[in-house]
A protein has these predicted regions:
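Domain-level signature for soluble enzymes in the chorismate/prephenate branch of the shikimate pathway
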Residues: 1-80
Length: 80
C-alpha cells in the first residue's frame, strides 16, 4: 500500500469521525435540554469519569489509552 492510499484511508476515517462527532453533539444537546427541563445539573462528574474508564478500557495500549482519555475529556467539555 502506498502513501496516497494510506492517506485516503485516514481521510475516510476523519470524515466518519466528523459525522459521529456531530451526531454526538446533537444528542448531548438533547440530554442537556432534558436535564435543564427536569431540574438536574448538566455536569455529571461521576458519569464523565465512568465514560473515561469505559473508553480507555477499549484501547489496546497505553499510548492509545492516554490519547482517548484526552480526546473524550475535550469532547465532554465541549458538550456541556
Amino acid at each position: 500500500m502506498d502513501l496516497t492510499e494510506l492517506r485516503g484511508q485516514i481521510d475516510e476515517i476523519d470524515s466518519s469521525i466528523v459525522d459521529l462527532y456531530e451526531k454526538r453533539m446533537d444528542i448531548s444537546r438533547q440530554v442537556a435540554e432534558y436535564k435543564i427541563e427536569n431540574g438536574k445539573q448538566v455536569f455529571d462528574k461521576a458519569r464523565e469519569e465512568e465514560k473515561i474508564r469505559k473508553v480507555k478500557s477499549q484501547t489496546h495500549n497505553e499510548f492509545n489509552s492516554h490519547g482517548v482519555e484526552e480526546l473524550f475529556e475535550q469532547i465532554m467539555s465541549m458538550s456541556r
